[in-house]
Amino acid sequence: MANLKDIRDRIKSVKNTRKITEAMRLVAAAKVRRAQEQVLRSRPFADRLSRILENLQSRMRFEEADAPLMEQRTVETITLVAITGDRGLCGGYNANIIKRTEQRFAELKGKGFNVKLVVIGSKAISYFSNRDYPIQAKITGLEQVPTADEANTIATDMLAEFMAAGTDRVEMVFTKFINLVSCKPVLQTLLPLDPQDIADPEDEIFNLTTDQGRLTVEPGTSSANTAPKIPSDIVFEQSPDQLLNALLPLYLQNQLLRCLQESAASELASRMTAMNNASDNAKELAKTLTLDYNKARQAAITQEILEVVGGSAAAGG
């Protein structure tokens, strides 16, 4: 049986590890809530912008207009954008995105397309750089809660590449936040743009609460303040194509920001779940080690008693 000191050291190490994972779980839980609130705050603007673009798009069907960002070209070159995190300890979050990106890359190459990668996050950069993928751009160091300025910088580069005919389509692989324990890697086409209704009547949110003295997260719902429908008879001062070409870059920035926000929320939720599982496992391991320690201590005491009894019997004999 293991030495008592070794078991004591392991118990101490496991308990210290549990303190760390529990702290990381609480930090991730607080940041998940903040990330969700950011998504909810931006939804009314995104909804109103989407409705305006739909209205303009429907009018353009009956007019001669030119909207380069919506132009459906013959596709030869595709830019594939993958969003991962800069850090680990978040379960399968990064691995799932990398796997989905590799699958999509193989699909497109199999169909004869020229594919370029734009990788966001140090995990994707490290993985694809070591495997000789055609990487066009590497982006890292984004805020944990993405900002509009960061989305605008990335969107500007995408627009320049698309308008210069450097790429015919831009696809984004990111993690869609479904709920606290469920996140799904999804594929979305960013360019050419196709405005559509993005309103979601109800968003699931999570509130910090306590359960038997322990901080935890409780799911709930919050109705989104969606924008009203745009009247069909509204009169715009500018022509539809002028408005469309002015608003489409803003729409792209907003869509990209949403992808970054959902990815950030998914990473934090995955980290919270991973740290929660690690804390539970550490608790169970500490119990097992404590039981082993008590058994070893009992065996040592029993052995000492037997030796004393044996010695007394020998002396008396």
UniProtKB/Swiss-Prot annotation:
It is a peripheral membrane protein. Gene3D superfamilies: 3.40.1380.10, ATP synthase, gamma subunit, helix hairpin domain. It holds the Pfam family ATP-synt. It is found in: Cellular thylakoid membrane. Transmembrane segments: none annotated. Its main location: membrane. Keywords: ATP synthesis, CF(1), Hydrogen ion transport, Ion transport, Membrane, Thylakoid, Transport. Signal peptide: none annotated. One of its GO terms (molecular function) is proton-transporting ATP synthase activity, rotational mechanism. GO terms for cellular component: plasma membrane-derived thylakoid membrane; proton-transporting ATP synthase complex. F-type ATPases have 2 components, CF(1) - the catalytic core - and CF(0) - the membrane proton channel. CF(1) has five subunits: alpha(3), beta(3), gamma(1), delta(1), epsilon(1). CF(0) has three main subunits: a, b and c. Belongs to the ATPase gamma chain family. Produces ATP from ADP in the presence of a proton gradient across the membrane. The gamma chain is believed to be important in regulating ATPase activity and the flow of protons through the CF(0) complex. This is ATP synthase gamma chain. It comes from Synechococcus sp. (strain CC9902). The lineage of its organism: Bacteria, Bacillati, Cyanobacteriota, Cyanophyceae, Synechococcales.
